[in-house]
Amino acid sequence: MTRMVANRFDLPEPIKISCIGGVWRYDEPQFARYRYFTQWDAEIYGVADPSADAEIIALSSDILESVGLKEHLVKISNRKLVEGFLRGLGIQSQNDLDHLIRIIDKVGKIGSEQAEREFTRAGLSKDKVKRILGFADISGDPDQVLGELEKKLPKGDMIHQGFKELSGTVDRVESLGKKPKIKVDLAIVRGISYYDGTVFEAYDQDGEDVGAILGGGRFDKLCKIYGKRDMPATGVAGGYERLMLSLERKDLFPDIQQRPEVFVVTVNESVWNDAVKIAQQLRSHNIRADYDLKQRPLGKQLEYADSLKVGICLVLGPREIKEGTVRMKDMKTGEEKSVKLSSAVDEIRKTLG
């Protein structure tokens, strides 16, 4: 989407855009991680203010609320804050910074002991490793964490810019009524290097082993790479497969009835076209209706209808067509009666309840 937006000078800003599509990534397939998955995205272009980040975070929370994942938590941080801290430790090479940020991104998955070994292999002293792990361990209530950080932050333009952006995002999230759903967690950095500001991930608190259900953040420099202009941007993306896994675990899939409510049975082939018309008429009244495409004998049709657990069978023959009636059979009670075709819809609804 960024490549498209970066070259569309005709679009009025701010640009709000979304898409859904298949995504490939080079990854080792494992629980809740896939090489191919279906992803949705929502992005805002042209706004540098934290209000855009807050709106994306609020949208993310609203999406999870709408599907029933009410016990979710959005963990937020800021890449400038983390990178500024690392630079304060004397790490200046961008390659080294990107490598260390990727390790921080894995702390929650691999644990602090494994992360310590990876930091040590990267050439860091024990003191620096301890300080980085301590920094990444900072998390909690936004007001409390930001209050403590403000007192203890080391000097540096980048780290203070990151703090300003993060604080501004929290303020605006509060205005959108979503502050109870967020938590500051400095271990959230998003491992992809194009993120350069506020970042976040959302988890179902009852199933964090699934991983982040969605995540995103600010990527202000990406438009310049794909187009001819600088344009601030922020967004969010999520995979349908992980979302479905979380919903399935909590039995949150809606109870959508797939089987027909009414099955139109024909006495012989001569009335088959009439049965098709009746079924279609019932469908036009939002009654799930079906008929036997295989045109089997009456007994086989009734057996098939019973296997589908339909509520009602309409039995149609030449006499019923002549009289403008149909025999309506309640499949639960076995009761059968003749009804006028003109009143069949009302009779069916009464029986189905």
Enumerate the language-model features and the residues they cover:
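Acidic, His- and aromatic-enriched active-site or binding-groove loops in soluble protein domains
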Residues: 91-112, 204-206
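Short, conserved phosphate-binding/catalytic loop or strand-edge motifs used
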Residues: 34-40, 76-84
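Hydrophobic mid-domain F-helix/FG-region of cytochrome P450s
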Residues: 59-65, 80-89
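Phosphate-rich ligand and nucleic-acid binding surfaces
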Residues: 84-91, 109, 126
